[in-house]
């Protein structure tokens, strides 16, 4: 039974300490014998951690673990064996039913044969097809296992999914949203079941047909990052470096936590793939002692598998292989990228175990290491040298009587390099870190020289590891001084990629930040000896399968802690550990929460669950070379604050724009309410509700104005802050540019590195600033709109097409959409440029409109739109009425003047004329169209006889009534005479206008009832235009009406009406040609008009007084 993870196992004998690997496993250190072991020195049991599981039915010293693919096997710590069969029942686990396990009986072998048995290995975990093939070939000279004859299954969907074991317990089931990997990447709700370390998903909870399966071991369960580009709130992912990334989403945060915990537990059964090893021969194998403490055996594993291809490599291929190793490539007879897993190699971590006959692994050989012997000088090569691309193997440096190791040509070359390096003395030994880079080693290196200050029997980190100028190693002062000594101020420089150097600094920070007061087990002056190669290999869980070691074997070669100068099993024996671990995973190796536990402190719970979520993928490791440089952090902070401020400014601008729109709406509603009150001034009971609404609108407008003022001030403050941050970034960029220019004059290696880093920072700043400049360019336009946001200002909307408020100026018009619906035809052509410029260029305060005598009438598209609005005037929303000025309201409060009604009639006539001209579709010029009106043509009269007759008949009654009330004799006066008469009779027009206004309202309500087909039909529009003619003509002037009535013969009613309409249209044309001229010019234009021949021949000769009347009223 393995020891429980409690305080009892911390009680160790004297000279024994413990340590914790990066993976979270606990190992024990014998300070006297300079050895390590997984087994507790008292109980003889291994400590159970998150990597292993302890079953109650296993004998003492046995442990349960999982392979890279998720197959279960058992570890015998007592005999150092691994097997896939249960030690009690002798049967394989039922969980392995989805794997093909080819176990071959191991024949009885002699002791010499056993010495040559290589370690077992797990083969072929390809990118998307996993085959668990535990073939055993004990006599294989090259340590190669057989492969399955075919792929067992492909991970994927439906038919390629893993077959679910119905007897396996279900860890968790429920609904999850999963994002599609292709197409629109939609989120689909699926029923997920987590069972037997595999995540199955179905269409519904019936669990009838498997839609897909995800084998969670080797997946990394983590929250989303900005690179994922997913905005879902409760979303997480299952990432794998060589397979697709699955994105999941839940409805609540609690569900997300539960699912992530369950999936993490399933994913953490392993961490890394294993590496293949060469066969190992041994002579003079020592006798094993209890717990293997005095003579701890360490597996020596070559870097590249010993096969025929590697043996036959040419010199060029050797060089290429070594350089590829420096870049983190695996060798399997050919170069391939780091992320490929064509062959999963067994790592050194299953190190110290031999496989039995029922074991899927092959035997392992060990050799003793006595660190007190004189051979320590050869064995303990500086760790600085081990970090280089030329990684030595210490095994061949022993005497031939100790060990005979067969290696590939590349490894022999490394051995030769080691001998040369050792012959150069300790001064050359101190240069090791320079080879700990990832660029080709044929580049020159500049090393600072310093004498070694360490005993030869210990492996250490580089002794002259002064940080680069742009990075600071945050060790404590006492440790820093004790380590570096007087010459430590010299700078270590590197011409190569800085990833590894940054990793070294990060290691130093994490291991020494809080440990200056912790006791050392010796008086050596080098606290940097706490790091060994296993520190780099013990990554958090899980990492990429291509990184070297699977979880099943990860803990077999524990690392030593900073507290001890002894070498861990891997460091002492396996000096050819896959350098990719430390070369491309600095973030995996030293994360702040993953620290070893000091001897004098209480053990803290180290769970792989807590470690796994903090790791990053291998691709991310290369992109943060100077992540912890203070200047870079400062740049990141400035850019982040600038981006956040940009968001704030954008939000405030949107809020301000919304407030402007609300303010304008309230203004329109308030003015419409005022107009409604004005129109019903003689009926206080009818306007009581409108008065209340007006009060509410006034309060709302005041509140909106206050909020608008606050928002404007807040936006200004936000822009000032934005400008300040932008200025800071600009200053920083200029300083960096100056620094870059200065470094361009210096031709040194460190200057080249700094130039590259500064250039990266400049590019990053440029990218951010260009992205923000798009919003900044719109600032000027937005501010103009805010400053000119008067009720009738159109500056703010100048880029939004025609100002929609122009359409709202029509009386009782609510929205543009209503005008469109009522018109039933396209918008009218723009009115004259003079009118448009007057409206758009005038800015008046709330509730004040331009005086009517000096500006054109409110613009509307067509006469049809006006008619539609007039016919539903009583039922229109109050805030859509046409606003009136304060002067108008004051005048109306005193008396109702007929000229107001006349002006409205003139407006309708003008709009009617525009509609007729547009209908004619001949592009007639309105200013010069006084020769003949469109309605004067015989074709128009013939086309519309029904409308003309209908209009005449409906208005005969009203005209007769008006004539009886006004006993004015008709005369054929000239326009000048008519003006004089109009001035004399103006006071009498008040009563008549009131009566006429009532008659007009009745007529409009009768004439403009909606047709069944709606107001959009062409027929309806024509009818409405004709309906408008007669009231406009008749109500134009009381005298004109009298003249028309007295001269109207019974036998020619249609001619009278037509002539009246035609001549009044001529009047409108004349008026429209001079909208802004003086009264004198208008009178001259009126006098210049003469009746056409048709009008002269007509029995009704005079509508000229109407012409003069209209001119008079529009000029006053």
From Swiss-Prot:
What GO terms are given for molecular function? Answer: phosphatidylinositol-3,5-bisphosphate binding; phosphatidylinositol-3-phosphate binding; phosphatidylinositol-4-phosphate binding; phosphatidylinositol-5-phosphate binding
Q: Which keywords are on file for this protein?
A: Acetylation, Cytoplasm, Isopeptide bond, Phosphoprotein, Repeat, Ubl conjugation
InterPro entries, per this entry?
PH-like_dom_sf, PH_domain, PKHA4-7_PH, WW_dom, WW_dom_sf
Residues bearing Phosphothreonine are: 438, 460
Q: Where found? A: Cytoplasm
Q: Where is the PH domain?
A: 169-268
Q: What is known of its domains?
A: Specifically interacts with PI3P, PI4P, PI5P, and PI(3,5)P2.
Q: What is this protein called?
A: Pleckstrin homology domain-containing family A member 5
Whose protein is this, by species? Homo sapiens (Human)
Q: What is the lineage of its organism?
A: Eukaryota, Metazoa, Chordata, Craniata, Vertebrata
Query: Which gene is the coding source of this polypeptide chain?
Result: PLEKHA5
């Amino acid at each position: 039974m393995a020891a429980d993870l409690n305080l009892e196992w911390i009680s160790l004998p004297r000279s024994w300490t413990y340590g914790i690997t990066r993976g979270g496993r606990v190992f024990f250190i014998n300070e006297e014998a300079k050895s390590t072991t997984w087994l507790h020195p008292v109980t003889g049991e291994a400590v159970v951690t998150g990597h292993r599981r302890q079953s109650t039915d296993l004998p003492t010293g046995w442990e349960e673990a999982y392979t890279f693919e998720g197959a279960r096997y058992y570890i015998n710590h007592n005999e150092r064996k691994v097997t896939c069969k249960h030690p009690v029942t002798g049967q394989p686990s039922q969980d392995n039913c989805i794997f093909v396990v080819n176990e071959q009986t191991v024949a009885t072998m002699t002791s010499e044969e056993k010495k040559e048995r290589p370690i077992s290995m797990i083969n072929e975990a390809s990118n998307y097809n996993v085959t668990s093939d535990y073939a055993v070939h004990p006599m294989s000279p090259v340590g190669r296992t057989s492969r399955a004859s075919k792929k067992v299954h492909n991970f994927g969907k439906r038919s390629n999914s893993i077959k679910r074991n119905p007897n396996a317990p279900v860890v968790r089931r429920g609904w999850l949203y999963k994002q599609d990997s292709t197409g629109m990447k939609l989120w689909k709700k699926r029923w997920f079941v987590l069972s037997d370390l595999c995540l199955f998903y179905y269409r519904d909870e019936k669990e009838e047909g498997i839609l897909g399966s995800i084998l969670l071991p080797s997946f990394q369960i983590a929250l989303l990052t900005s690179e994922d580009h997913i905005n879902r709130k409760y979303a997480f992912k299952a990432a794998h470096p060589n397979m697709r990334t699955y994105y999941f989403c839940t409805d609540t945060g609690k569900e997300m936590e539960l699912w992530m915990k369950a999936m993490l537990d399933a994913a953490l059964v392993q961490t890394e793939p294993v590496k293949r090893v060469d066969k190992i021969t041994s002579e003079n194998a020592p006798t094993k002692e209890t717990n293997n403490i005095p003579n701890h055996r360490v597996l020596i594993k070559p870097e590249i598998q010993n096969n025929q291809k590697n043996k036959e490599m040419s010199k060029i291929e050797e060089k290429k292989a070594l350089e590829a190793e420096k870049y983190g490539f695996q060798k399997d007879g050919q170069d391939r990228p780091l992320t490929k897993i064509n062959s999963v190699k067994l790592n050194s971590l299953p190190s110290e175990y031999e496989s039995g006959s029922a074991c899927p692994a092959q035997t392992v050989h060990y050799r003793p290491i006595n660190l007190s012997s004189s051979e320590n000088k050869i064995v303990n090569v500086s760790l600085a040298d081990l970090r280089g691309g030329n990684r030595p193997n210490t095994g061949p440096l022993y005497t031939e009587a100790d060990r005979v190791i067969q290696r590939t040509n590349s490894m022999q070359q490394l051995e030769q390099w080691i001998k040369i390096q050792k012959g150069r003395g300790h001064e050359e030994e101190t240069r090791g870190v320079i080879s700990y880079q990832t660029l080709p080693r044929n580049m020159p290196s500049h090393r600072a020289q310093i004498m070694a200050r360490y005993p030869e029997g210990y492996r250490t980190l580089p002794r002259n590891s002064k940080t680069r100028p742009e990075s600071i190693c945050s060790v404590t002062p006492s440790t820093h001084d004790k380590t570096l000594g007087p010459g430590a101020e010299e700078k270590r420089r590197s011409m190569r990629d800085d990833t590894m150097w940054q990793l070294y600094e990060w290691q130093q920070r994490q291991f020494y930040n809080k440990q200056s007061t912790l006791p050392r087990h010796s008086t050596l002056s080098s606290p940097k000896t706490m790091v060994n190669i296993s520190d780099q290999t013990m990554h958090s869980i899980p990492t990429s399968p291509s990184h070297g070691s699977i979880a099943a074997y990860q803990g077999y070669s524990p690392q030593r802690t900073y507290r001890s100068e002894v070498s861990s099993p891997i460091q002492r024996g396996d000096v050819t550990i896959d350098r990719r671990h430390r070369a491309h995973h600095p973030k995996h190796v030293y994360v702040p929460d993953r620290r070893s536990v000091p001897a004098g402190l209480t053990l803290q719970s180290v769970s792989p669950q807590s470690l796994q979520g903090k790791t990053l993928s291998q691709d991310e490791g290369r992109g943060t070379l100077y992540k912890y440089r203070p200047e870079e952090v400062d740049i990141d902070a400035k850019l982040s604050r600038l981006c956040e401020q940009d968001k704030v400014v954008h939000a405030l601008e949107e809020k301000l724009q919304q407030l402007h729109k609300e303010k304008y709406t309230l203004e329109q509603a308030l003015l419409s309410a005022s107009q409604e009150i004005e129109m019903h001034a003689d009926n206080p009971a009818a306007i009581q509700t409108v008065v209340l609404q007006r009060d509410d609108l006034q309060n709302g407008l005041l509140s909106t104005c206050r909020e608008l003022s606050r928002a404007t001030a807040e936006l200004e403050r936000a822009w000032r802050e934005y400008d300040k941050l932008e200025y800071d970034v600009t200053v920083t960029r200029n300083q960096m540019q100056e620094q870059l220019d200065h470094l361009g004059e210096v031709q040194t290696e460190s200057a080249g590195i700094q130039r590259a880093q500064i250039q990266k920072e400049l590019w990053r700043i440029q990218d951010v600033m260009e992205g923000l400049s798009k919003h900044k360019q719109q600032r000027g336009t937005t501010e103009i709109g805010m400053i000119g946001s008067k009720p009738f200002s159109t500056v703010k909307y100048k880029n939004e097409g025609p100002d929609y408020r122009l359409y709202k100026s029509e009386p009782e018009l609510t929205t543009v959409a209503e005008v469109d619906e009522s018109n039933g035809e396209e918008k009218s052509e723009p009115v004259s440029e003079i009118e448009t410029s007057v409206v758009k260029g005038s800015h008046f305060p709330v509730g004040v409109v331009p005086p009517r005598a000096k500006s054109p009438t409110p613009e509307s598209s067509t006469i049809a739109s006006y008619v539609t609005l007039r016919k539903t005037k009583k039922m229109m929303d109050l805030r859509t009425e046409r606003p009136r000025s304060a002067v108008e309201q004051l005048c109306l409060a005193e008396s109702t003047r007929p000229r107001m009604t006349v002006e409205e009639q003139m407006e309708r006539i003008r709009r009617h004329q525009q509609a007729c001209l547009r209908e004619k579709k001949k592009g007639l010029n309105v200013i010069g169209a006084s020769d003949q009106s469109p309605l004067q043509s015989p074709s128009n009269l013939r086309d519309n006889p029904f409308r003309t007759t209908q209009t005449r008949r409906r208005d005969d009654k009203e005209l007769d009534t008006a004539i009886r009330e006004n006993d004015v004799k008709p005369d054929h006066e000239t326009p000048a005479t008519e003006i004089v008469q109009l001035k004399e009779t103006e006071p009498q027009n008040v009563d008549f206008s009131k009566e006429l206004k009532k008659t007009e309202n009745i007529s409009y309500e009768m004439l403009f009832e909606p047709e069944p087909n709606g107001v959009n039909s062409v027929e309806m529009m024509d009818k409405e235009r004709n309906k408008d003619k007669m009231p406009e003509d008749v109500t134009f002037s009381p005298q004109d009406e009298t003249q028309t009535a007295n001269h109207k013969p019974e036998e020619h009613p249609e001619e009278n009406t037509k002539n009246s309409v035609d001549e009044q249209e001529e009047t409108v044309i004349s008026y429209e040609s001079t909208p802004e001229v003086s009264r004198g010019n208008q009178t001259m234009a009126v006098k210049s008009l003469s009746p056409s021949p048709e009008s002269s021949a007509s029995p009704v000769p005079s509508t000229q007084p109407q012409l003069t009347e209209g001119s008079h009223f529009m000029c006053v």
